[in-house]
A protein has these predicted regions:
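Conserved class I S-adenosyl-L-methionine
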Residues: 52-62, 145-175
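Class I SAM-dependent methyltransferase SAM/SAH-binding core
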Residues: 65-105
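A C-terminal cap/extension of S-adenosyl-L-methionine-dependent methyltransferases
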Residues: 92-94, 99, 196-204, 208-258
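A short acidic, Gly/Pro-enriched loop at the edge of an enzyme's catalytic core
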Residues: 105-117
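A short SAM/SAH-binding and catalytic strip from SAM-dependent methyltransferases
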Residues: 115-128
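A short glycine-rich, Lys/Arg-flanked "PGG" loop and its adjoining helix->strand segment in the class I
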Residues: 130-145
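Acceptor-substrate binding/catalytic loop of class I
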Residues: 180-196
């Protein structure tokens, strides 16, 4: 990365007119690809049936097709929330989806409103992950489920040519203050939390982990001895590229601490 250029781009993205213009060209995960949306829905539905459920999806970007599939499969209601308006409230309403924008902190939703919360490759972009995880716990009903797939890679490397597979976690080379100075205002920002840090956040919020599935980067594992910037992490944290979790809000608060 050319650090001065990265910092300048980040500063420019702090101006609303420029950010709004750039938003038109954002790639947000599924990008309304119906086939991909169906696969993500099947992933979610494999953890818990959607029939009769009130569902919230966090960070859908341009893709409301996953929630449309949920409604077609028997969900009672579907709500989407994001930090940027990738579609309008009216467009979502036509699909029978309630659409909200939030500030990345408090969810403008009632406590105990949902049975299911979904998120696909969005949590890694959270600027305030501990706050949002706590908010997920608040808006879930007791016995409710959170399913999230979190991509732990450096998103600024995605889509580039001549990128080595060993650069998957290149973002971890930089101290937090410098990373934030380069990326905070940009869609390629990631919070760089590792698997164990996510699991700690979920536990501290009160969730019970029902399932946790990890994908390992074989490329990183094969060259790990040479990647000294990763040596401060445990082996699991150093090589895990994706973690998918299924979490439950306990029926009784006492169960969360057991």
């Amino acid at each position: 990365m050319v650090l001065p250029l990265e910092i300048l781009q980040n500063l420019l993205m702090g101006f609303s007119p420029i950010a709004n213009l750039a938003q038109r060209y954002h790639s947000t995960g599924l990008n309304a690809d119906l086939a991909k949306a169906c696969r993500v829905f099947e992933l979610y539905a494999g953890f818990r049936s959607v029939v009769g459920m009130d569902i919230l999806e966090i960070g859908p970007g341009q893709t409301l097709e996953v929630l449309e599939k949920a409604l077609a499969s028997g969900a009672k209601s579907c709500t989407a929330i994001d930090v940027a308006a990738y579609c309008s409230v009216g467009q979502a309403a036509e699909k029978r989806i309630s659409y909200h924008i939030y500030d990345g902190r408090r969810l403008p939703l009632e406590a105990g409103q949902f049975d299911l919360i979904w998120s696909h490759t969005a949590f890694e972009h959270l600027r305030y992950p501990a706050v949002t995880v706590g908010e997920c716990f608040r808006v879930l009903r007791p016995g409710g489920t959170l399913v999230s797939s979190i991509d732990l890679g450096d998103h600024s490397m995605y889509g580039k040519t001549r990128v080595s597979p060993e650069q998957l976690f290149d973002s971890l080379r930089y101290p937090k203050w410098l990373w934030d100075l380069m990326k905070w205002n940009r869609s390629s920002y990631t919070n760089r939390l590792r698997k164990s840090e996510w699991m700690a956040l979920f536990h501290n919020a009160g969730f019970v982990v029902l399932q946790a599935e990890s994908q390992i980067s074989k490329d990183i594992a094969s060259v790990l001895p040479a990647l000294t910037y990763l040596h401060r992490f445990s082996y699991d944290d150093a090589v895990t590229s994706v973690v998918t979790v299924c979490l439950e809000k306990p029926q009784s608060p006492a169960l969360a601490s057991s």
